[in-house]
Regions:
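C-terminal motif of bacterial Sec signal peptides marking the signal peptidase cleavage site
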Residues: 6-8
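Bacterial signal peptide processing site
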Residues: 10-13
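Compositionally biased P/S/T/G-rich terminal and signal peptide-adjacent segments
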Residues: 18-104
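Stable alpha-helical elements in mature extracytoplasmic
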Residues: 21, 33, 37, 118-128, ...
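Amphipathic, interaction-prone secondary-structure segments
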Residues: 49-54, 59, 69, 174-200
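Broad, structure-driven detector of short, well-ordered beta-strand segments within folded domains
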Residues: 76-96, 183-184, 189-204
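Long, charged/polar, surface-exposed segments that mediate recognition or autoinhibition
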Residues: 86-164, 179, 206-242
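A cross-kingdom marker for long, charged
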Residues: 215-280
């Protein structure tokens, strides 16, 4: 009995050790990314008739996951993850593996936190993305709002457009007292990331903040914006791509004229990244 009891205590201690640090899951894109998802999955792949397959991972509190999005020197870690879903595009001409990764996570480990705790977690998160080389991104058919209008953009459009000029604690608090959500769009070597910070619940003076990450290969993002983008190849694809870029330019000019009328400044120096290398 004493021996069994000791074994039970040791097992309990070992379990506590295991769960004291969240497990790190490494996820990435492409065929390699598909293998990674499958290696962690407890359920089968959800294949949909619309031509997409979904690879689901879920975790429940208190044992949330840490997820490393493995992009070499541009990698970053998402803490306190509740779920991750990889998407494969089955109507591609050949298997290109995971093209979209969606992750839901808590901004903080604790469910409800003070404004100060949330603010420190926001700074740590954005600092990590800055260090990994993620840059501000504008859709090619939208306005290139100048950094000086960051707060105006956050309040009117719900978008951070100067991600690494960190808000002050007062600016953070003032914003979330007025609005429940804000998003940022970033780009890094063929991967597009949109992340939102959502204030979801309150308890006494404390708040809950959720993070939603949507990452797409720029190959998928661009081909999906072109009619029959996944059916075309070679010169046909190049022609369709160029036509799409011309359309985007016209749309951007229209939206930027409107933005100026609304008191926004335009960042003429912003250049769209060269994405053709990933699309062809």
């Amino acid at each position: 009995f004493i021996l069994l009891n000791l074994q039970g205590c040791n097992a309990e201690r070992n379990n506590k050790k295991v769960f004291s640090q969240p497990e790190l899951y490494t996820l990435n894109f492409g065929v390699e990314g598909e293998k990674k998802f499958k290696s962690y999955m407890q359920t089968g792949v959800d294949q949909q008739p619309a031509g997409m397959s979904f690879f689901d991972l879920t975790w429940g509190p208190p044992h949330l996951a840490n997820i490393k999005i493995d992009l070499g020197e541009h990698s970053f870690v998402i803490k306190n993850a509740f779920s991750a879903m990889g998407t494969r595009i089955d109507y591609a001409q050949q298997n290109e593996g995971i093209q979209i990764i969606d992750v839901t996570a808590g901004l903080n480990k604790e469910e409800f936190v003070s404004q100060e705790q949330a603010y420190m977690a926001y700074k740590e998160l954005f600092g990590q993305l800055q260090k990994a080389g993620w840059e501000q991104y504008f859709y090619p058919n939208t306005s290139r709002i100048a950094k000086q209008d960051n707060i105006k953009s956050m309040i009117e459009d719900g978008l951070i457009i100067d991600p690494y000029n960190f808000l002050t604690l007062t600016e953070w608090t003032d914003f979330f007292n007025k609005k429940p959500t804000v998003a940022v769009r970033l780009y890094n070597h063929g991967i597009f990331l949109e992340m939102s910070i959502d204030k979801t619940k309150s308890e006494n003076d404390k708040k809950q903040y959720m993070l939603r990450y949507s990452m797409e290969t720029i190959r998928y993002n661009t081909k999906n914006s072109i009619k029959d983008g996944y059916k075309l190849s070679g010169q046909e694809l190049k022609t369709a791509f160029n036509e799409r870029m011309k359309y985007n330019e016209k749309q951007r000019a229209k939206f930027e004229n409107q933005a100026k009328k609304e008191g926004f400044h335009i960042d003429e120096s912003y250049q769209d990244p060269d994405v053709w290398q990933y699309v062809k």
